[in-house]
Amino acid sequence: MSRRMLSTLFLCGAIGLWPAGGLSAESGLSVHHDLMLVLHPSENKLSGLDTITIEQGKFSTLTLLLSKGATVHDVTVSGKSRAFVFKDGQLLILLQNNDRKAPLILSIRYSASFHDPVPDTFASTDNPGHGVAGIISTQGTFLQAGAGWYPEIPGSRPTFHLLVEAPAGTLAVTSGRCLGHQTKNGRTSSEWATQFPSEGLSMSAGPYTVREKNFESVTVATYFFPESASLSHDYLNAAGRYLALYQELIGPYPFQQFSIVENFFPTGYGFPSYTLLGSTVIRLPFIIETSLGHEIAHCWWGNGVLVDYSHGNWCEGLTTYLADHLYKERISDEEARQYRLQILRNFTTLVNPGDDFPLSQFRGRYDPASQAIGYGKSAMVFHMLRIGIGEQAFWEGLKDVFRAKLFKEASWKDFQIAFEARAGVSLESFFEQWVFRKGAPQFSLKNPAMKKQQASWIITGSIVQKEPPYDLDLPIRMSAASGRRDSKIPVRGTEATFQVSLQVRPSRLVVDPECDVMRILYPSEIPPSVNSLKGSSSVLVVLPKASFSKRKQVAGFLAGSLSLKKFRIIPEDELKAGDVKENDVLLVGLPENGSPPFKMPEGLTLQRHRFKVNERDYDRPSDSFFGVFRSSVHEERVVALFQPLSEKHADEVARKITHYGSYSYLVFREGRNEAKGTWPVTESPLFHEWEEE
């Protein structure tokens, strides 16, 4: 997850105050911050002295950004006081004639308070920022880039030297290389330096225990709270494996150190050369196997090679493909296929026409639909590129971009140029339809037929796609008892016919058997899931009348956790027959009158004080069931049921359901997931079976 967007938002208000020529990365401006901070956790504040060296540029005024809640005490230029105006987070400094020469050395002494409220748990992962830009407290400190905790020159990419003084035992950690921690006279100082320019600096502090391990020239460190220190060994070794993997695939690690830092509230952030994980997050079993590697991959893509946001954020999709998807691929081909299938299901269920946009307009995720586009669809674009141009051209092209654009902005166009050079083909139409056009194709198999012709079997049919058509090379697979044959069908326009000759009689024909092509699925291909509800445009949350007041709070919390766009909570007796046709439904508790409006899947039994899933009975008060079903009233609607057998763990479970987006049903006991699964898919317009002779 990138932290650059806040800086962009802050920047917008200052454009009018910039001198002609501007202070920007494009102008070649060189900026260095020598920043000294003193943290006062019990007062939620800091005191700062920032000495900024500007190597180039001629201007009569300077405008810098600082927290609106800050107080600027004095400003000097080359050791001499200068007049300034500080208002609404903008610091305007008036320069004199003899100041207008390089280097310009500017010192700003200031103080600021940061006390954003922090959550105890993840309410939702779709916008993981929680609104916490900055907090200084006795529990810990988190100050993110763009929060205004140091004076920022908009558009610059500075380097930093940071010295932080805090109460004894409180260590500060940020991007770059640690120059040491020292405790003296009841105070602990932490010193850091960045070697390469960055778009902003984030910083954390807390009572950390530090563990380090060297992997060739890279130091990996964990900054964990004492109660979590036992986890360091596994995290250090896993980080070493990921560093070795990406150095082999892409190129040298761009930084000198990588730090894994524990946060006192739930986060999952990746910054240049360090990741910040909440205390609850680092204990999750899948973090080391997936999320940690994802954040380390961002050191190459997003924090190493920077993103040109004006032309779309490519780095989330590329990182997803080179981390989450690659790890599945290394387990097995089937695991990777299932991962791609889930991308297609997520896109189809979460992205409504009104929410869709092209990848060239993706900046960062803010809801389930934007994640399905910017992470999922984007990952599929890189997958299709890899298949289309071949392994060598794909990996060498990535290495070329990394070498050419390290610590510079890159756009989709840069990837296109690199891949074209390696593959020796034009990719103009590919990028045009997949990056600059919203949506995805939807295609089906039409009139499949088979006939015997002398010693061969002739298979014919058509591929039909909806308007507007895509240029596709669709894989098809014909299977027989003795083996299978794969072919590719070029599709140009809304319909393409094909004919394939086989020496054996096939029993099955499948289009895109490995889910290698980005597409919109048909309803029959998508089992109802948590994501089906998250992608709904309108949900009625229905509670039994007798427990309405008791369960209304948990119902609202569940709706918020799922990031439902539009929902209404009503008692059961207000539900009308037409409502189920016009809305998706979330039942919090079984209906008091009649049966729920969905078909009960095989292996599932639901009662008010017990339920049975796959032959296992659940009847403890701490047991909870959540399931999503196809509506029995309207086949395009879904009905979900949340059935906690008591109120004890209902809130805790409601917070966790959103994390299981791909699943149809979930079982929890004492707040822990006990079982999960997906209803089977038995039909698809992309396969055809012939009966045996």
Each predicted region: which residue ranges?
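N-terminal, polar/Ser/Thr-rich
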Residues: 15-47, 71-73, 78, 130-134, ...
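Beta-strand-rich binding/interaction modules
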Residues: 71-76, 427-428, 441-444, 448-512
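Surface-exposed beta-strand/loop patches in extracellular or lumenal glycoproteins
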Residues: 49-69, 150-167, 413, 460-477, ...
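A surface-exposed beta-strand-loop module
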Residues: 67-128, 186, 493-505
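Solvent-exposed alpha-helical segments and adjacent loops
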Residues: 527-693
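Hydrophobic alpha-helical and helix-loop surface patches within well-folded domains
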Residues: 50, 192, 222-462
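Extended, low-hydrophobicity, Ser/Thr/Pro/Gly-biased non-transmembrane segments
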Residues: 109-208
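Short acidic/polar inter-strand loop motif in beta-rich domains
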Residues: 112-119, 513-524
